[in-house]
A protein has these predicted regions:
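Short acidic DE-rich linear segments
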Residues: 1-6, 82-89
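N-terminal acidic leader/helix
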Residues: 3-40
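Generic detector of leucine side chains in alpha-helical contexts
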Residues: 8, 25-27, 52, 72-73, ...
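Intrinsic disorder/low-complexity segments in short proteins, especially the signal peptide
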Residues: 13, 77-78, 87
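Extended rod-forming repeat segments used as scaffolds/tethers
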Residues: 20, 29-31, 44, 48-49, ...
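Long, hydrophobic, amphipathic alpha-helical segments used as structural scaffolds
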Residues: 27, 31-34, 57-64, 84-87
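Acidic, low-complexity, intrinsically disordered interaction modules
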Residues: 36-77
């Protein structure tokens, strides 16, 4: 049985790349926090954002672009924006 080809989308790939850079930047800022308690608090709050980013990336790598792709990215974006509004970083 032949494997179904993934549907690719260059604009979506750009959004994933931009999201990756945002996650890396925030993680770097969190790791730069000297106070261990505050760093732990920020990290635990940001873990959900990282999880949602990983879900978007993994889904795209495995299945390509499909009907649910934009929804997954929207969930990530909402979580990222919520984190930014609740935590000053």
């Amino acid at each position: 049985m032949t494997k179904k080809r993934r549907k690719l989308n260059k604009d979506f790939e750009k959004k994933i790349y931009s999201s990756k850079k945002n996650v890396e930047l925030v993680l770097a800022k969190i790791y730069d926090i000297d106070d261990e308690d505050i760093q732990t608090e920020y990290m635990s709050a940001f873990n959900n954002v990282v999880y949602l980013y990983d879900a978007v990336k993994e889904d795209y790598d495995q299945q390509g672009f499909h009907d649910n792709s934009e929804g997954l990215l929207k969930n990530y974006s909402n979580a990222f924006n919520l984190f930014e509004s609740e935590f000053e970083i």
